[in-house]
């Protein structure tokens, strides 16, 4: 990633930095400012990683604070996560899209289902207005057996023989360990920005990307008789009781495959009631007395209604607890 015409901000001062041929840089100029952030000039729709440091001379001190998609050619990013301090510097780096991932900008949406939704469950209430305040990347596909084995050296799936099938029979600790090992490997190789990490999606993030801007039962519509679901999902009626290679069905409007069906997907959250009202970046409850973690999306051996965007289900968080219909997809985010 290369810095492109980025403003570096130090508390109440701005340091203007520009990329020059051959890496030569003139002495920085300082101007007064009352914010902590960076002014980014680039192509509308392009994605940047915003980083900060207290020591701009130390190369390894820069840490990512946000992914930003430019709404205009000249965009001012202001970091409101912590109060401005005099020793904070910022820069913006053009982000190359990670392989097979989709960028999701910040947004607000309604989580849960209305009381009149067909085949809904009671735990989908109350509907909750959720704001996701930070952009993130999410995998187009469920993590495959080939990807999992490449990172961990193991393949616990009971459906081996095709590396394009989703990994399954993985516990929640297995899934989070995969994210940790992948993060360390990609950071060491310089393929992801410093300070970023792979992780499981939160339940709110998962439902938001599954809906892809819709409020219907599925990302493609309500489909009350499930006539179109077979075009998008593997489930009990067409799945032949086995997991299928990823990407064989149609994607949702944001380009995510198998978000309905194939295998259930682990989320980061402990299971809890939806809070109702308006919330920002919900993480779920701090614990669950029984040890349930949230899973989403439905699976090849579950009913059509279980593939709905709002369907909430759960499974135990224990290294020995897994199932042949349970896998995951990953998010790349700034902590």
Predicted regions and their residues:
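A short glycine-rich, aromatic-capped structural motif
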Residues: 97-157, 170-173, 260-261, 330
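Short, flexible loop/turn segments at beta-strand junctions in immunoglobulin-like
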Residues: 80-83, 169, 248
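Acidic glycine-/aspartate-rich tracts in secreted/extracellular proteins
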Residues: 44-46, 53-58, 95, 114-115, ...
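Surface-exposed recognition segments
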Residues: 117-130, 214, 222-224, 239-242, ...
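Short strand-edge motifs at loop-to-beta-strand transitions and within beta-strands
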Residues: 75-77, 165, 244
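Short, composition-biased motifs enriched in small/polar/acidic residues
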Residues: 5-7, 11, 15-100
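Short, well-ordered surface patches within globular domains
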Residues: 109, 162-229, 266, 272
């Amino acid at each position: 990633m290369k810095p492109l015409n980025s403003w570096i901000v130090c508390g109440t001062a701005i340091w203007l930095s520009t990329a020059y041929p051959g890496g030569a840089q003139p002495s920085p100029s300082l101007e007064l400012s009352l914010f902590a952030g960076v002014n980014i000039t680039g192509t509308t729709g392009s994605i940047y990683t915003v980083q900060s440091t207290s020591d701009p001379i130390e190369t390894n001190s820069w840490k990512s604070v946000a992914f930003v998609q430019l709404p205009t050619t000249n965009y001012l990013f202001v970091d409101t996560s912590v109060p401005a301090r005099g020793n904070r510097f910022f820069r913006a780096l053009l982000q190359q899209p990670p392989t097979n991932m989709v960028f999701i900008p910040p947004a607000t949406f309604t989580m849960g289902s209305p009381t009149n939704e067909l085949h809904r469950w009671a735990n989908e209430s109350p509907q909750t207005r959720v704001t996701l305040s930070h952009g993130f990347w999410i995998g187009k596909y469920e993590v495959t057996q080939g990807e999992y084995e490449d990172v961990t050296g193991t393949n616990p799936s009971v459906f081996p023989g095709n590396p394009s099938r989703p990994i399954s029979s993985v516990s929640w600790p297995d899934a989070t360990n995969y994210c940790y090992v992948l993060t360390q490997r990609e950071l060491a190789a310089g393929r992801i920005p410093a300070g970023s990490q792979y992780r499981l999606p939160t339940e709110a993030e998962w439902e938001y990307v599954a809906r892809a801007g819709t409020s219907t039962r599925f990302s493609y519509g309500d489909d009350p008789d499930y006539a179109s679901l077979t075009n998008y999902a593997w489930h009990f009626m067409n799945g032949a009781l086995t997991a299928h290679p990823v990407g064989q069905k149609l994607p949702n409007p944001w380009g995510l495959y198998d978000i309905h069906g194939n295998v259930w997907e682990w989320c980061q959250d402990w299971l809890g009631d939806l809070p109702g009202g308006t919330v920002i970046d919900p993480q779920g409850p701090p614990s669950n007395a029984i040890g349930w973690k949230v899973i989403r999306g439905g699976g090849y051996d579950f009913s059509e209604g279980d593939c709905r965007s709002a369907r909430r289900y759960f499974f135990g968080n224990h290294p020995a607890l897994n199932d042949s219909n349970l896998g995951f997809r990953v998010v790349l985010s700034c902590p």
